[in-house]
């Protein structure tokens, strides 16, 4: 029986006598070279008393900063540590939560998955039932100075917690108020003041508002909205499906070939409608952390050719598949072998994307960095700007002319020449060439099997939405009824008002404080190509400047280009 009399099967561990240094979070010890080194796990604090959007944002950023070293970053998304070879003194972080009632509990998070493994309240510590002996041994290093240690008979997965709570996540409210109540419930469980269903419900709240918010910028954004408006509400389908898909998304991204998935992953929008994700591009601003799934293959190409330096303690190398995709570019048109004729030297062109299985728009991304259609290679005619791109036999073409790298920002580059794939016109039938890279819309591409632009709202400073207003753009109160707040994200890197897809979000100059406008997409210029970054900014690739709410003052009704500083007026989030 647990103190207080709640009926629950628990196992009580004998507690060894430890030297106590007065810390409420406990000390962990690791044995190296026959020496014992005490080390306190890092502690991050958060209080619901007077919580603000900024205090919560700072808290989640601090949690992320402690969960990952930043040594392993793939497609701009940090990867959590591999549990194999991870020293025990680096295995956990502690999150100390307090509330208006001045009650305090300390959660323990596993750095390998950002998940809660247990918590401390006063002189008692409680742990979810571990999945294996290794985890069972690891948690013995947590809260070593408590008088009482208990392990629940249940694990911490959502299915079991929902069963115990008697409710599903989609019916459990989240927000600052629910978190306040959850802290009290966890605290009073040690005295018998909390029943098991309430305890399970409280775990669900804490896990979503801390672990899931650390994993996803999207979920962090949802929690910020609740705090901003002092709102209590249950998560919508977009949140639930992200939570359920984190492991599969991590696997798909790490096993992707230059960002393209071997098979799609289905997610849901806020209204419950389903959509499939075929590539990493839309996920870069959505996912903050990935669980480690596999080591990068030796030949894999990373964002802008920067390879992460991480130790490989085992042989679990990523699959490195060879997906078959369409390559979507300027104005949503596809890379196409002209007239479906595969004789050597036939031109590659822009053409409306097909929905059938015609080979001349299907491209295999090969491990050798060739891009092939019907077994033949996408090949540049030479290494000078302006030469055309053709289909050619892979075995007889010049090897360097058939090699391409696909960057996360949508650039397809020939390494030999440092020239990039380009469409100098946005019309159907335009012959593709290679050109000097200026990060223009005419040089933006996306290997995917979803040929339609991704439609989204874009939320920025103070939870306000980016809105097109004739030729101007600024932020206003968000409303699902406002069509002018809907944006189509094109594969070529342009951001277009859903109401008029012939227009583009545009900077007509590359200098700081240039006012961003809505202008014709016709130029397909460098000032019309953008990238959603993992840090929440929207980057103009050519200038290196980001979208910024001028002076953090929405009343000025100006969005400008500005150097990166990372303040809230430069942070944006696509919501679906």
Swiss-Prot record:
Q: Which residues are glycosylated?
A: 45, 271
Question: What residues form the catalytic site here?
Answer: 115, 158, 212, 215
Stretches forming 1-alpha repeats: 331-373
Ranges where the Ricin B-type lectin domain occurs: 321-448, 451-575
- On the tree of life, the source organism's domain of life is Eukaryota
Q: Where are the 2-alpha repeats?
A: 462-497
Q: Where are the 1-gamma repeats?
A: 417-449
Q: Which SMART domains match?
A: RICIN
Q: Identify the keywords attached in UniProt to this record, alphabetized.
A: Disulfide bond, Glycoprotein, Hydrolase, Lectin, Nucleotide-binding, Plant defense, Protein synthesis inhibitor, Repeat, Signal, Toxin
Q: Name one Pfam family in it.
A: RIP
* Residues the entry annotates as binding AMP: 115-116, 156-158
Give residue ranges of the 2-gamma repeats.
Answer: 543-570
Q: Which residues form the propeptide?
A: 303-314
Q: Where are the 1-beta repeats?
A: 374-414
Record has Signal as a keyword = yes
Q: What is its EC number?
A: 3.2.2.22
Checking PROSITE patterns in the record gives:
RICIN_B_LECTIN (PS50231), SHIGA_RICIN (PS00275)
Q: What class of enzyme is it?
A: hydrolase
For whether the record's keyword set contains Disulfide bond, the answer is yes
| Effect ascribed to mutating residue 110 to A/E/N | Suppresses the toxic activity
Impact after mutating residue 111 to A/M: No effect on the toxic activity or the vascular leak syndrome
Concerning CDD domains, the annotation shows: beta-trefoil_Ricin-like_rpt1, beta-trefoil_Ricin_like_rpt2
**GO:BP terms for this protein?**
defense response; killing of cells of another organism; negative regulation of translation
Described function: Ricin is highly toxic to animal cells, and to a lesser extent to plant cells.
Tell me which PANTHER family the record gives. Answer: PTHR33453, RIBOSOME-INACTIVATING PROTEIN
What protein is this chain from? Answer: Ricin
Could you tell me which species this protein originates from? Answer: Ricinus communis (Castor bean)
Query: What taxonomic lineage is listed for the species of origin?
Result: Eukaryota, Viridiplantae, Streptophyta, Embryophyta, Tracheophyta
């Amino acid at each position: 029986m647990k103190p207080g009399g709640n009926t629950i099967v628990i196992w009580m561990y004998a507690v060894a006598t430890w030297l106590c240094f007065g810390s409420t979070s406990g000390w962990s010890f690791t044995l190296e070279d026959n020496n014992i080194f005490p080390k306190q796990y890092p502690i991050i604090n958060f209080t619901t008393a007077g919580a603000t959007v900024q205090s919560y944002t700072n808290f989640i950023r601090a949690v992320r900063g402690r969960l990952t070293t930043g040594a392993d970053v793939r497609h701009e998304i940090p990867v959590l540590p591999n549990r194999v070879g991870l020293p025990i003194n680096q295995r956990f972080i502690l999150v100390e939560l307090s509330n208006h009632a001045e009650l305090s509990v300390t959660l323990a998070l596993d750095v390998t998955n950002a998940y809660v493994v247990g918590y401390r309240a006063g002189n008692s510590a409680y742990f979810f039932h571990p999945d294996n002996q290794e985890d069972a041994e690891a948690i013995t290093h947590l809260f070593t100075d408590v008088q009482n240690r208990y392990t629940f008979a249940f694990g911490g997965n959502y299915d079991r917690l929902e069963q115990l709570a008697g409710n599903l996540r989609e019916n459990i409210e989240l927000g600052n108020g629910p978190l306040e109540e959850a802290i009290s419930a966890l605290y009073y469980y040690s005295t018998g003041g909390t029943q098991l269903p309430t305890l399970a419900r409280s775990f669900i709240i804490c896990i979503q508002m801390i672990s899931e918010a650390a994993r996803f910028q999207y979920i962090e954004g949802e929690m910020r909205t609740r705090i901003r408006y002092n709102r209590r509400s249950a998560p919508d389908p977009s949140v639930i499906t992200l939570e359920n898909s984190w492991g599969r998304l991590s696997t798909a991204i790490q096993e992707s070939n230059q960002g393209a998935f071997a098979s799609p992953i289905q997610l849901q929008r806020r209204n419950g409608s389903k959509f499939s994700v075929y590539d990493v591009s839309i996920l870069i601003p959505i996912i903050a952390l990935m669980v480690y799934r596999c080591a990068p293959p030796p030949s894999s190409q990373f964002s802008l050719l920067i390879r992460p330096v991480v130790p490989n303690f085992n042989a679990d190398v990523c699959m490195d598949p060879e997906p078959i995709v369409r390559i979507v570019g300027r104005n949503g048109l596809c890379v196409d072998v002209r007239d479906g004729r595969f004789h050597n030297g036939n031109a590659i062109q822009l053409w409306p994307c097909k929905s059938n299985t015609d080979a001349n728009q299907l491209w295999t991304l090969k491990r050798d960095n060739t891009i092939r259609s019907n077994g033949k290679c996408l090949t540049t005619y030479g290494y000078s700007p302006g030469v055309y791109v053709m289909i050619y036999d892979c075995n007889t073409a010049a090897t360097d002319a058939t090699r391409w790298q696909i960057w996360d920002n949508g650039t397809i580059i020939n390494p030999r020449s440092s020239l990039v794939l380009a469409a100098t016109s946005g019309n159907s039938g335009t012959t593709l060439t290679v050109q000097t890279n200026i990060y223009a819309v005419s040089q933006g591409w996306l290997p995917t099997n979803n040929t339609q632009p991704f439609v989204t709202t874009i939320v920025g400073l103070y939870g306000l939405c980016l809105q097109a207003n004739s030729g101007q753009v600024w932020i206003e109160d968000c409303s699902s009824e406002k069509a002018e707040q809907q944006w189509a994200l094109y594969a070529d890197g342009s951001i277009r008002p859903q109401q008029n897809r012939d227009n583009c979000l545009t900077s007509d100059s590359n200098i700081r404080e240039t006012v961003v406008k809505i202008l014709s997409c016709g130029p397909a210029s460098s000032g019309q190509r953008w990238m959603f970054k993992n840090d929440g900014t929207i980057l103009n690739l050519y200038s290196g400047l980001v979208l910024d709410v001028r002076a953090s003052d929405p009343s000025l009704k100006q969005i400008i280009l500005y150097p990166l500083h990372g303040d809230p007026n430069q942070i944006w989030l696509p919501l679906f």
